């Protein structure tokens, strides 16, 4: 009898260990950028992986080598098939990933977006660096701080005509220009397609085509340094170069005076927040508008309605977490940041 009881206890222990191992294995989160090899996304990935270690969750950072729907869909499908139970993706297209993401959700995978959103029905929570009016407004204000002419010529230059986040910011920026700077002329809107060489060529082409250009607004991590390098190559120090990129990439241009102001947010914290939110979804099942989470070294973040991003779609377990702050970098503060 004693032997039988011991065998049963041993069996229960083995089953408990098996269950614990299965649960631990299931706590895997994939963190996907638009593409690898770009400092902005690498920094976000570092924040995500560090958060995973702090939480005891396995976080994998991986992305395509080129920004494409097909590349991201392949990664999403691979992660789902490998048993990952949460995916956080910076989407190259608002709709192109939706079929794959909806299939993943039907299989019980938690889907979140960061940096660049999908249509809201294709994910649960979007970890958002700022609303379109916040970021579009930053772009115009940085240019206006440097352009003193009433009748100025301005070019927009960023990654692609289909990427969600940047097009939302640019729309708001153009609306703000029309309302507050009606005499500014937007002479062109061009794209570098996340390619460093093409971005430099495009930026040089813009400067050559408009010898009297007053500003380039470049809300893209590749486009902004390319515009700054093009201005240096062509000795066009009279053009205001503003936009979004990381301080480590832009530091030399700020130190040389080519760029007076540029903006961003703490993308390391964005990666960290993304993983904390994903982990909370794995524990609770969902998060709803009004729910809050206290994240170490960052503070309290709150789920807000999709309408802050201009969406009409609202649903249970669906919303947006907006980063607490954004930063304008200048020569006076850039050395306080290292990412």
Curated annotation (Swiss-Prot):
GO cellular component: ATP-binding cassette (ABC) transporter complex; outer membrane-bounded periplasmic space
Principal localisation: periplasm
Function: Part of the ABC transporter complex LsrABCD involved in autoinducer 2 (AI-2) import. Binds AI-2 and delivers it to the LsrC and LsrD permeases.
Domain of life, source organism: Bacteria
Coiled-coil stretches noted in the UniProt entry, renumbered to this chain: none
Species assigned in the record: Photorhabdus luminescens
Pfam families: Peripla_BP_4 (PF13407)
Subunit structure of this chain's protein: The complex is composed of two ATP-binding proteins (LsrA), two transmembrane proteins (LsrC and LsrD) and a solute-binding protein (LsrB).
Similarity comment text for this entry: Belongs to the bacterial solute-binding protein 2 family.
Signal peptide: 1-25
Record's protein name: Autoinducer 2-binding protein LsrB
Localization per Swiss-Prot or TrEMBL: Periplasm
Keyword Lipoprotein found: no
Any one GO molecular function term: carbohydrate binding
Keyword list, A-Z: Periplasm, Signal
